[in-house]
Structure formats: structure tokens, C-alpha cells
């Protein structure tokens, strides 16, 4: 089309997405599990209820407000696939700050360019990540990136591995120190439907990464509607999207969509082939996953090891299989299905 295309949703509407994803569930499903976290190590897992998640989000929101973060400010999140990633996203939304997540596997240069481009005032990271049995030096990478990011005033660091990392006086704060003594309630910032919710950068495969801005009202409706209807989600089911929160699929189908619908969402820190190539199917059995959403690349990689690693698991709980990220070839789909 020629000329400007402008699409606006519910333009005079006001909401805060965390009220839709958290507060409205407290009366009826406060003690239901919101997030099942499955660690890189198969022996590590935890569960967070809606009530617990709400409290943790409010505590971080209060800490961020105390650091001067205001509605419209940009906050960079550079975290592994741990509960804190979801808490950080929702805490930003709670106070009207715009989150910009950078995938934990990206380099200091990639992190720096994204922080500079969106002029972030706060970085939320961790000491280290874990991936396939190896440590990922997130704080070291962040410190390197921040040498060229004068806009960052504060850094909140989650203690994940307990690795020894440098902390800069006045700038860096341990997550627990910043949050643990904060009140467990926090007033949600009223947001216009067209107010920004997050920025996420394109992969950069076709030139410089571009920051794509997603607004509040239309995005949440789409996330909730598609999670409910595309996956035929039924109350009480366990939903697992294997994406990283660093990608838009992770934003939508690990955090915002499932939580808006009061679902139990699974968050996986690891990789499909660690410690064995049966890992996906073992996790499905362990947590009785009903809906499974993964990528053709992962399926094709697992196909190379044949059916034996799959068949040693039950997978009886599965009802729906989804594929995302690229077109799936018939051979991969038939093997998967």
C-alpha cells in the first residue's frame, strides 16, 4: 500500500497487563502453580504459584521504582531461562517500564548495541547462566558491554550459580538485597492500550538489528487468544513452549499468553540433548505436559538419533503438538507426530 498504515487497538482503553496475568487470578487460583521451572540439571526444578509470583513481581517493581525507574523508561533484561526472567518482565510491565530482552547467548557487543539503541536506564542480569552443563558468564559479558553504555544507572544481579563476579559499588545490586525487604504489593501503573509494553530486536540476519515495539492492548489480546484457541488450551493443563524468553515466541507463549489465561507454563533452562537426547521426552513425563510447542530445528536434530531415545519414555500425557519458528518439512512433522 502507499501512504501510512496505522492500526490502533482499543485506543481509549486502559489496563496493566500484570492485572490480567496475575491479580485477577489470585481469588480463584492463587495457590495454583503458575510456572514450573526445570533446570539444566535434571535434578533441579521448582514451582511458583500465582500468589508467589504476584508477590515477587511486586517486590521487584517496588525495588525498580526505588531506583528511579519510571513509566516509559527502558529496562534491559539479560538473563538465563530462570524464574527471575519472567518476574523481571512482569515487574517492568507493572510499573510501565518498557522491557528489552537480550538473549543470554548474545555477546557483549550485541548487548551493548541493544542497550544503546533503546537508551536503557537499568540492566537486570545474573551472575552466570547454565546451558548444556556449561556456565555462561553473563555478568562478565554485561560488565564488558556496559563500558560503552552510559545510560545505565543501576544493575540488578540475580544469584543463579553462586559464581564469583565483580560488583561495582553504587551501580550493582544483588537481586535479593534489592527485593527481599520490599512490600509484596505494588500499585500497577495504568497503561493506555497503545502504550509500549516491550521492545524486542530482530535477529540482525538482514542488516542491523531493528527494535520492534509491541504495545499493550493488542499484544495481550493476541497472546491470550492464540494461546487459548490455537492450542485448544483447557483449564488445568500443563503447557510447555521450549523457546527462550529472548525470542518473541518465549515472550508470548512462556509468559504473557499462558499467564493471561491462568495456565501452568513450563520454563526450561536446558537444551534438548543434555544430559541425553531423551531430555525433552523425560521432562514431558516428569511434569505430565499436555501441550508441547517446539521448533523444527530441534526436531530434526533429535531425529538423527532415531526413535529409541523417544520410545524409552511414555509421553502419555501429551494431547497437542505445536511447531514454530520456520516451516516444518513433511519428514520432520511425520516423525514428530
UniProtKB/Swiss-Prot annotation:
State the top-level EC class. Answer: ligase
Gene Ontology terms for molecular function: acetate-CoA ligase activity; ATP binding; metal ion binding
Which Pfam families does this one have? AMP-binding
Residues that, per the record, bind ATP:
325-327
The entry's CoA-binding residues are 131-134, 249, 273
The free-text function statement in the UniProt record for this protein reads: Catalyzes the conversion of acetate into acetyl-CoA (AcCoA), an essential intermediate at the junction of anabolic and catabolic pathways. AcsA undergoes a two-step reaction. In the first half reaction, AcsA combines acetate with ATP to form acetyl-adenylate (AcAMP) intermediate. In the second half reaction, it can then transfer the acetyl group from AcAMP to the sulfhydryl group of CoA, forming the product AcCoA.
In its UniProt entry, what is this protein called? Acetyl-coenzyme A synthetase
Q: Which organism is it from?
A: Nostoc linckia
